[in-house]
UniProtKB/Swiss-Prot annotation:
Disulfide bridge partners, by residue number: 122-128, 182-304, 480-483
Enzyme Commission code(s) on record: 1.8.1.8
Major localization class: membrane
Record keywords, A-Z: Cell inner membrane, Cell membrane, Cytochrome c-type biogenesis, Disulfide bond, Electron transport, Membrane, NAD, Oxidoreductase, Redox-active center, Signal, Transmembrane, Transmembrane helix, Transport
Secretion signal, residue range per the UniProt entry: 1-19
Cellular localisation: Cell inner membrane
Gene: dsbD
Gene Ontology BP annotations: cell redox homeostasis; cytochrome complex assembly
Name under which the protein is recorded: Thiol:disulfide interchange protein DsbD
Uppermost EC category: oxidoreductase
Source organism per UniProt: Escherichia coli O157:H7
Residue ranges crossing the lipid bilayer per the database entry: 163-183, 208-228, 243-263, 296-316, 323-343, 357-377, 384-404, 418-438
Classification via SUPFAM superfamilies: Thiol:disulfide interchange protein DsbD, N-terminal domain (DsbD-alpha) (SSF74863), Thioredoxin-like (SSF52833)
Length: 565
């Protein structure tokens, strides 16, 4: 019995040993594309569901999903919102993980109609697949007017849009708006109206009435926030379109110009007059009348409040978040009401004296609003140009603040001026690098000199012309993030270049993914990119030396040493 157990253990160990002997050390750790993104479809008359089961550690690009009908007509396809993914070279992109279900409405399909579905994805470990195309056969569908409406796509774990400010900023903005020239001088008058002209109210009573007034104003703003957030939720996909983002950028820029005094934005004077008359008919000093006065006051926008309020509303529309929408506008109204409550309780002695500084506060808010166009444009133009826009905005703001501070006479302002000047110098650095190209020239001096090939025949010819030298073939594509990382961090390393000094360097750019590219990848049995192949002097590949996925310079140098005989 003991002998049998010993024999069984020996067989199991031998099996694992032999498996290890024949297991290629260079075998890819990544699965084929159909396992990474298991695609399936199901049609029921006009309704077609496309599904992707996405393997853990992999993701699909939202912008790379394309659907093209052949001999069929489909409704507009609305892709659900994904989650944001960011990398160094392509900036922010929306991706899908775990599972994606995409409903498609088929308005009409002839016999033999098909749907061509193209998609592309990557692995978190630094490996990207070429664009994959699937052909979906369609059952014949007769045109039906009821099916012509676009499908409402369920939002799969809809994330909150990543916006640059928290709702708490709205409170600070509201307080800041209170010190603009259109608002601050009105507070004593508003305080008198709220109290109904009664001078001998107790402090608690005066504070209560003012608080009720502020809550009425906050109710109006909160309702605006909820409505705009609900509208933004319905049109969330459209709000992410580049043309819409550019349009919003123009609107925000115009709002900022109004804060600089170049434009004037406010409600029509006739409408403001009607709202003011309605407010004046309310009885001051009573809770009900004060609340209605505050509600109406929230609709009366002065030139100083129109631009910030519009900016916050558009900001909320971008989020599509109901809680954020209502909460942000409530805090904004509360911020505007805090100075009024203080004045009502403590009197005008707390008010700072009016002067040019109020115009400077208004101008400063113009720069705050200008930050939103930069944030929106960053999604369209990428992080590189986005950084340059942030740099330009920083230089403009700190430069303006420095010039404005020169009018101050107090000694401690000299310290502030030095800080502002230093901040402007730091902000200008990205623009300086762009203008003089310092970083670019440093990088271009260290690239490897690859010979480009395109087809299988060109590869075979290059292997023959190597004349006994070892050959390295780098498969590259513009859509491959890790390929760019190889270029920037690995191939630029002096140790890597030294190790490849006696190696013939070939590169195949398969960005187009055309028939020749597909044939080359199939011939070499390549799943995705980056993939680097090594051939000996006789033109035979060493499969165990194949590299799939990104390697840093140190790891790649060690890999090159290990492959040497």
């Amino acid at each position: 019995m003991a002998q049998r157990i010993f024999t069984l253990i020996l067989l199991l160990c031998s099996t694992s040993v032999f498996a290890g002997l024949f297991d290629a050390p260079g075998r890819s750790q990544f699965v084929p594309v159909d396992q990474a993104f298991a695609f399936d479809f199901q049609q029921n008359q006009h309704d077609l569901n496309l599904t992707w089961q996405i393997k853990d550690g992999y993701y699909l690009y939202r912008k790379q999903i394309r659907i093209t009908p052949e001999h069929a007509k489909i409704a507009d396809v609305q892709l659900p919102q994904g989650v944001w993914h960011e990398d160094e070279f392509y900036g922010k992109s929306e991706i899908y993980r775990d599972r994606l279900t995409l409903p498609v409405t088929i308005n009409q399909a002839s016999a033999g109609a098909t749907l061509t579905v193209t998609y592309q994805g990557c692995a978190d470990a630094g490996f990207c697949y070429p664009p994959e195309t699937k052909t979906v056969p369609l059952s014949e569908v007769v045109a039906n007017n009821a099916a012509s409406q676009p499908v409402s796509v369920p939002q799969q774990e809809q994330p909150t849009a990543q916006l640059p400010f928290s709702a708490l900023w709205a409170l600070l903005i509201g307080i800041g708006i209170a010190f603009t020239p259109c608002v601050l001088p009105m507070y004593p008058l508003i305080s008198g109206i709220v109290l109904g002209g009664k001078q001998r109210l107790s402090t608690a009573r005066a504070l209560l009435l003012t608080f009720i007034y502020v809550q009425g104003m906050a109710l109006t703003y909160t309702a605006l926030g909820l409505v705009v957030a609900a509208a933004g939720l319905q049109f969330q996909a459209a709000l992410q379109h580049p043309y819409v983002l550019i349009g919003l950028t123009i609107v925000f820029t115009l709002l900022a110009m109004s804060m600089f005094g170049l434009l004037t934005l406010q409600l029509p004077s006739s409408l403001q007059t009607r709202l003011t008359l309605m407010s004046n008919r309310q009885q001051g000093g009573s809770p009900g009348g004060v609340f209605i006065m505050g509600t109406i006051a929230g609709l009366i926008c002065s030139p100083c409040t129109t631009a910030p309020l519009s900016a916050i509303l558009l900001y909320i529309a971008q989020s599509g978040n109901m809680w954020l929408g209502g909460g942000t506008l409530y805090l904004y109204a509360l911020g505007m009401g805090l100075p009024l409550m203080l004045i009502t309780v403590f009197g005008n002695r707390l008010l700072p004296k009016s002067g040019p500084w109020m115009e400077q506060v208004k101008t400063a808010f113009g720069f705050v609003i200008l930050a939103l166009p930069v944030f929106l444009l960053e999604r369209v133009i990428g992080d590189v140009w986005g950084l340059r826009l942030w740099s330009a905005l920083g230089v403009a703001f700190f430069g303006w603040a420095f010039i404005t501070s020169l009018q101050a006479k107090r000694g401690w302002m000299r310290v502030v001026q030095i800080i502002l000047l230093a901040a402007a110098l730091v902000s200008v650095r990205p623009l300086q690098d762009w203008a003089f190209g310092a970083t670019h020239t440093a990088q271009t001096q260290t690239h490897l000199n690859f010979t480009q090939i395109k087809t299988v025949d060109e590869l075979n010819q290059a292997l023959v012309e190597a004349k006994g030298k070892p050959v390295m073939l780098d498969l590259y594509a513009d859509w491959c993030v890790a390929c760019k990382e190889f270029e920037k961090y690995t191939f630029s390393d002096p140790q890597v270049q030294k190790a490849l000094a006696d190696t013939v360097l070939l590169q195949a750019n398969v960005t187009a993914n055309d028939a020749q590219d597909v044939a080359l990848l199939k011939h070499l049995n390549v799943l995705g990119l980056p993939t680097i192949l090594f051939f000996d002097g006789q033109g035979q590949e060493h499969p165990q030396a194949r590299v799939t996925g990104f390697m840093d310079a140190e790891t790649f140098s060690a890999h090159l040493r290990d492959r040497q005989p």
